[in-house]
């Protein structure tokens, strides 16, 4: 598939996970096979008001490319202004968030709340498309709730407004992340539009990725929560789609080696103080499912320095060897 002039293989992309898909996560994901990444959602109002925190979310390193920055908001002019400001960071595309279900975003008219106002969503897409000379992509859900499944109508409006590609999460806003993803709604969107469609939701294994490809006809799949502490999933999906081979899960040693590198990148980009505190959640994700993981989870929450991480890694590996 192509987003603008960018050709992407039929493998998997990293979703714009808030609080997770930062520079370190995007770089690690690219190293392990993600063909495309989308950064954390960034407030259009925050950018327009000069928020340093919002601007920091847009920073991109060469090792992460190709990548898109993601913006959210409910005002066409503000979204267009934010998109123009994002051009400074030279992303390959601008992604618009019409899918975030969390109350602090949707409750303020952003994210998935726009699914209740397709006409306004279309005006936002049109404004952003006119503001930048980059492909503009859109991420949205099946609908607001089970009584209002409007993804097909919504997709057509976004396409008519100039969107270059669409990402569909096969759940409604009210469903959040709980029930199994609805592959049928992704298939219906794919059949309704002529631009590329990316399927999202429950892609947690190579087999799940292939099933989404096969049952929806989507052009690409996007991995979200399943990539946390598990960047190997991208490589495993890539190999499975290309050859049918199911690569083994990483060894404990491989997991800990990549955890250490991930934390080093966090410290490089955010400084040691912030990086080591963010290492807490990443450590708990990397050790998930390993021998003694429940016992070590408390230690993950106490990490404040590199030596704390080293001790944790040593203890985890010792536990796995027993």
Task: Indicate where each model-derived feature is located.
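Hydrophobic faces of well-ordered beta-strands that scaffold small-molecule active sites
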Residues: 12-15, 37-39, 67-71, 94, ...
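N-terminal small/glycine-rich loop or linker at the start of catalytic domains
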Residues: 1-12, 45-66, 100, 104-108, ...
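Alpha/beta catalytic cores of nucleotide-metabolism and tRNA/nucleoside-modifying enzymes
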Residues: 4, 8, 12, 18, ...
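Alpha/beta enzyme core
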Residues: 80-110, 118-195, 215
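Aromatic- and acidic-residue-enriched carbohydrate-binding clefts of CAZyme catalytic domains
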Residues: 115
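Active-site beta-loop-alpha junctions enriched in small/polar residues
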Residues: 17-19, 42-44, 72-74, 99-101, ...
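Glycine-rich, positively charged N-terminal anion/phosphate-binding segment
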Residues: 2, 17-92
């Amino acid at each position: 598939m192509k987003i603008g002039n960018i050709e992407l293989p039929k493998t998997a992309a990293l979703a714009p996970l808030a609080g997770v898909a930062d520079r370190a996560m995007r770089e690690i994901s690219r190293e392990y096979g993600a063909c495309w990444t989308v950064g954390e959602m960034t407030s259009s109002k925050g950018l327009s008001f000069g928020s340093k925190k919002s601007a920091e979310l847009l920073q991109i390193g060469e090792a992460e490319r190709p990548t898109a920055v993601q913006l959210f908001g409910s005002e066409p002019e503000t979204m267009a202004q934010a998109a123009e400001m994002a051009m400074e960071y030279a992303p390959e595309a601008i992604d618009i968030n019409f899918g975030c279900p969390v109350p602090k975003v949707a409750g303020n008219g952003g994210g998935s709340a726009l699914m209740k106002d397709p006409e306004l969503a279309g005006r936002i897409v049109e404004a952003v498309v006119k503001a930048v000379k980059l492909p503009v992509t859109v991420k949205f859900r099946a609908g607001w709730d089970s009584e209002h499944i409007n993804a097909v109508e919504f997709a057509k409006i976004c396409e008519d407004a100039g969107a270059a590609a669409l990402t569909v999460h096969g759940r409604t806003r009210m469903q959040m992340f709980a029930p199994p993803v609805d592959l049928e709604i992704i298939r219906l969107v794919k059949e309704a539009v002529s631009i590329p469609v990316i399927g999202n939701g429950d892609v947690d294994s190579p087999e799940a990725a292939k099933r989404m490809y096969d049952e929806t006809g989507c052009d690409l799949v996007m991995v979200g929560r399943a990539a946390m502490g598990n960047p190997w999933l991208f490589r495993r999906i890539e190999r499975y789609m290309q050859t049918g081979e199911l690569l083994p899960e990483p060894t404990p040693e491989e997991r800990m080696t990549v955890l250490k590198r991930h934390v080093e990148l966090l410290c490089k980009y955010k400084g040691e103080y912030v990086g080591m505190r963010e290492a807490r959640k990443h450590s708990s994700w990397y050790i998930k499912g390993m021998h003694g993981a429940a016992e070590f989870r408390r230690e993950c929450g106490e990490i404040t320095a590199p030596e704390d991480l080293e001790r944790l890694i040593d203890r985890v590996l010792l536990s796995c060897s027993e």
